[in-house]
Regions:
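C-terminal "post-core" interaction segments
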Residues: 1-105
Length: 105
């Protein structure tokens, strides 16, 4: 079970892809940052600094991670009600899925 959200970025997205290579992996959460690859920095006139990712990052089937994020099996987003109640809805969903899988076995 892998939990991801918009804070999952760069090397963490690469780690998620590695874990997902196991067919038993379930990924839940919301879109990751889609921001992995090397950083190429440059300086424009007047000392203005800039940077960009110089690599495309893909799954073997061609899915582009850049700007789209990692693949998600179950999309779960926090709700206003859950936030008000101090609940971790993503963790609750993960535990529920684990319980379902355990009962199936």
């Amino acid at each position: 079970m892998v939990l991801v959200n918009e804070m999952t970025q760069s090397y963490a997205e690469t780690c998620v892809q590695i874990i997902q290579s196991n067919n038993n992996t379930i990924t839940i959460g919301s879109q990751s940052a889609g921001a992995n690859g090397n950083i190429s920095k440059f300086t424009l006139p007047r000392g203005i600094l800039g940077a960009f990712s110089g690599l495309g990052w893909y799954y073997p089937d061609g899915w582009v991670v850049n700007r789209q994020g990692v693949k998600i099996d179950h999309e779960i987003r926090p709700t206003l009600e859950g936030i008000r109640d101090g609940r971790d809805e993503m963790l609750e969903a993960a535990l529920s899925l684990i319980e379902e899988k355990t009962e199936e076995e």
